[in-house]
Amino acid sequence: MADKITSRQQDYSQWYIDLVRSAKLADYSDVRGCMVIRPNGYAIWEKMQAALDGMFKETGHVNAYFPMFIPESFIAKEAEHIEGFAPECAVVTHGGGEELAEKLYVRPTSETIIWSSYKKWIQSYRDLPLLINQWANVVRWEMRTRLFLRTTEFLWQEGHTAHADPEEAQEEVIRMINVYRTFAEEYMAMPVIVGKKSESEKFAGADATYCIEAMMQDGKALQAGTSHNLGQNFAKAFDCQFQTKEGVLDYVWATSWGVSTRLIGALIMAHSDDKGLVLPPKLASRQVVIIPILKGDKEEVRAHARFIAKALNKHGISTFVDDSENNSPGWKFAEYELQGIPVRIELGPRDIAEGKCIVARRDTFEKTEVLLDAEMTENIEEILNNIQQNLYERALQFRQDNTVEATTWEEFKAGVEKGFVIAHWDGTDETEALIKEETKATIRVMPTDEEYRKQYNMDEPGTCIRSGNPATQKVVFAKAY
């Protein structure tokens, strides 16, 4: 029940954990750093998977599966890659009761094992582009874990593509980060900033990393998806060459891109409240709950509730009836608010007699009367669409209200305690590291979206917020998950 949840104002971190566990989304495992994704949480992941998988296939990608064990010699082939991931790796040293001749790494990501196969499959320009996605689990040995946001094992998808030239590879990088943006904004109702990572924040082994960054309700940033231009780095490491149209050998150009179950954590923190989970209808496996008020002729009320549910389900609106008598209607109202069901329909004998029902929205708690007529399904569908749009607009307004443009160091320090700060940066790793050391804020993204850049005059030259040196652009700073 909702009374188990600490308020956001009292303790935001505890609110998040309370909500995840009370809404039965996930729980702690007996395995250190790992979580159990419960049915309510996994249902959200399934909705995310279905939407994303459809978008991947629309852009020409196919699914495959590669081993979770990676030979140590493969990992060592890409020096920058292993340097970035070595501290997080889990290593298998024994199998079948014997010490292994070569250690096996449990995949922290799959570039190396996948490129060992791509080397065999790619011989000619006719074999390109190769556009493959994998749905899998990965392991990164995290020291400080939090359900969905940072766990030792998590679920994700990782796309790995090979191309004949750098231009096509870059087009793929941008195409896929825009797929993630579309998913975040149209399905998650979560506004994101699209852009490029700084050199210190980019993926280990990449030439460039692009990302989408979202603001959570505590003002912190969450990296919700990444798309990497790997150049020819992995192709050279695995000697993956192809014969060009001109008949000469060249190394292929590569990309990789991925999102994970951390998106569920982002979804929770972007929209939910002190009463529990708030879900955008497009990602709710159960969009409508009908709660019959069982007075008078109970079976007649039940029959009407089931008839409405059948009509809504036939219309593509996922609906169920809770006509159990173990708990009161009030208890059910609170329970389904906790679980984030977008719409609740209350239906009693008087409502049936008057040819109407009461419809309650989870996002605003607004109640309206809806007629029990032929247009009811369209009316409920319109309410669901309004909820989806309202959640996006509310989150966008929150981000705008908690974004500041800083021109002094004092403004900067105050701003990162509240949300995003847009400020000039001199482009050096040294200044970036100093800002992080002094404020815990990092460069989240160098925006590429023209509308966002224009809104905040990102190309305006100025003075670096920390060093005082000349700066050619502004970037987005924030504390982050």
Swiss-Prot record:
GO terms for cellular component: aminoacyl-tRNA synthetase multienzyme complex; cytoplasm. Its main location: cytoplasm. It comes from the Bacteria. It is found in: Cytoplasm. InterPro entries: aa-tRNA-synt_IIb, aa-tRNA-synth_II, aa-tRNA-synth_II/BPL/LPL, Anticodon-bd, Anticodon-bd_dom_sf, Pro-tRNA-ligase_IIa, Pro-tRNA-ligase_IIa_arc-type, Pro-tRNA_ligase_II_C. PROSITE patterns: AA_TRNA_LIGASE_II. GO terms for molecular function: ATP binding; proline-tRNA ligase activity. Its EC number is 6.1.1.15. One of its GO terms (biological process) is prolyl-tRNA aminoacylation. Keywords: Aminoacyl-tRNA synthetase, ATP-binding, Cytoplasm, Ligase, Nucleotide-binding, Protein biosynthesis. It holds the Pfam family tRNA-synt_2b. It catalyses: tRNA(Pro) + L-proline + ATP = L-prolyl-tRNA(Pro) + AMP + diphosphate. Homodimer. NCBIfam families: proS_fam_I (TIGR00408). Consists of three domains: the N-terminal catalytic domain, the anticodon-binding domain and the C-terminal extension. Catalyzes the attachment of proline to tRNA(Pro) in a two-step reaction: proline is first activated by ATP to form Pro-AMP and then transferred to the acceptor end of tRNA(Pro). Belongs to the class-II aminoacyl-tRNA synthetase family. ProS type 3 subfamily. This is Proline--tRNA ligase. It comes from Chlorobaculum parvum (strain DSM 263 / NCIMB 8327).
